[in-house]
């Protein structure tokens, strides 16, 4: 039987193992992953009020102001979102993810410089964060909802791995899955510099 607690333990262990494999590679292969950003989107310190000084960019369709994400299993766009106006105004929409529902972003370019995903979450239950690369769903983390709107913890995209496999850059999709309860998600961001 699936247990969110087991996933909370398994994901960091898998990430650490993959990082160890990558860092153990010969020095000659160290230049396989480009450290340049895939694009030149606007970066800002959206989470600085919560002691996160990293620069982030909005993921494609990450404000849920349009219907660019693919929704399945009862996922819906609903009125209201994070009240902190990190994008300049209060978010008018959010994503409702009842248990079993999923939402998948449009494709976006990542490389070793795009390691983290972060978003705002409210409601109850948990959200699974996956990265889809080359048709493979890669679990990246579990984000708990705690009632009112707050930033969720940082989850890892695995972009160094996908970028290394694909010659420097890769096209991925972000998939959010309702694992339990009825969480809501607002404003999905990618950190292109891993905390700096």
Where are these predicted regions, by residue range?
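Short, surface-exposed beta-strand/strand-loop-strand elements in extracellular ectodomains
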Residues: 128-135
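Hydrophobic residues on conserved beta-strands that form the core of alpha/beta folds
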Residues: 61, 105, 116, 151, ...
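Solvent-exposed strand-to-loop "edge" motifs in beta-rich extracellular domains
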Residues: 65-69, 108-114, 118-126, 177-179
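Bacterial N-terminal signal peptides that target proteins for export
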Residues: 2-12
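Short beta-strands within extracellular/lumenal beta-sheet-rich domains
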Residues: 87-116, 126
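Extracellular carbohydrate-recognition regions
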Residues: 31-78, 189-196
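Extracellular carbohydrate recognition and processing domains
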Residues: 50, 135-169, 175-184
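C-terminal segment of classical bacterial N-terminal signal peptides
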Residues: 17-27
């Amino acid at each position: 039987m699936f247990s969110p607690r087991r996933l909370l333990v398994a994901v960091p262990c898998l990430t650490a193992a993959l990082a160890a494999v990558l860092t153990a590679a010969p020095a000659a292969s160290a230049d396989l992953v480009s450290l340049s950003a895939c694009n030149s989107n606007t970066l800002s310190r959206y989470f600085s009020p919560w002691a996160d000084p990293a620069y982030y960019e909005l993921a494609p369709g990450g404000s849920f102001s349009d219907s660019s994400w693919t929704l399945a299993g009862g996922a819906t766009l609903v009125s209201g979102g994070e009240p902190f106006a990190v994008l300049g105004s209060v978010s008018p929409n959010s994503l409702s993810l009842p248990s079993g529902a999923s939402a998948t972003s449009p494709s976006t370019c990542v490389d070793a410089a795009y390691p983290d995903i972060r978003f705002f979450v409210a409601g109850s239950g948990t959200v699974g964060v996956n990265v889809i690369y080359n048709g493979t769903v890669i679990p990246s983390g579990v984000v708990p909802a705690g009632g009112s709107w707050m930033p969720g913890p940082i989850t890892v995209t695995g972009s160094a791995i996908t970028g290394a496999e694909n010659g420097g850059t890769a096209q991925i999709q972000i998939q959010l899955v309702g694992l339990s309860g009825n969480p809501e998600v607002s404003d999905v961001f990618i950190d292109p510099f891993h905390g700096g």
